Amino acid sequence: EMVNMDDVPVLAIATGHNEMLSNSNMASFVDMMESQNFQVVTFDMLTEEIPEDTQVLMIATPTTDYSAEEMDKLRTFLNDETREEPVSVMVTCYPTQGQMPNLTAFLEEWGVSPQAGLVAETDSGNMVVSDSTGVLVTPTDEILENNSYDRLVSYYSAPLEVLFEANADISTYELWTTSDSCYVITEDTTEEEAADPETA
């Protein structure tokens, strides 16, 4: 397959934290990114530098926390004003991933706070078949207007809280949202609460 680009953008997937997502279980995602002309590479955040020309850096559901030094690497990557092309960090979370104070503090600097629990849907029209954890999410009109992302399914998702919309030169916004008929299941949720959940 020919790629008609001078510089192929790089998607760099960070490793070294017993990630739940890896090359072995996200081959379809990697194939999709490569079909969009990304070069997909992996690297160890602790022992290696972020690969040159990385445009998207993915933190793929780690199960152990990042060190302060690794977080500083991420900040340097995002604050590099010598780069012409925009850069992004994509973080995936799991509902039971546990406490990660360094990674959580970094995300909160950018206006996002991962919450405990599992997002579930009560409206059968907004879920896949009869799986309440297979939630259909809605693109936000102002960001993804005129797009083709209207049938996106989010499985086993952790809820995220947006802490602010603007803070100094940082803007935070939602790309996709769940419906008002969703609720969050936590380890403290009783059977009675699950049978008659409080929704938004």
At which residue positions do the language-model features occur?
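Short, surface-exposed patches at the edges or C-terminal ends of soluble domains, predominantly
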Residues: 1-200
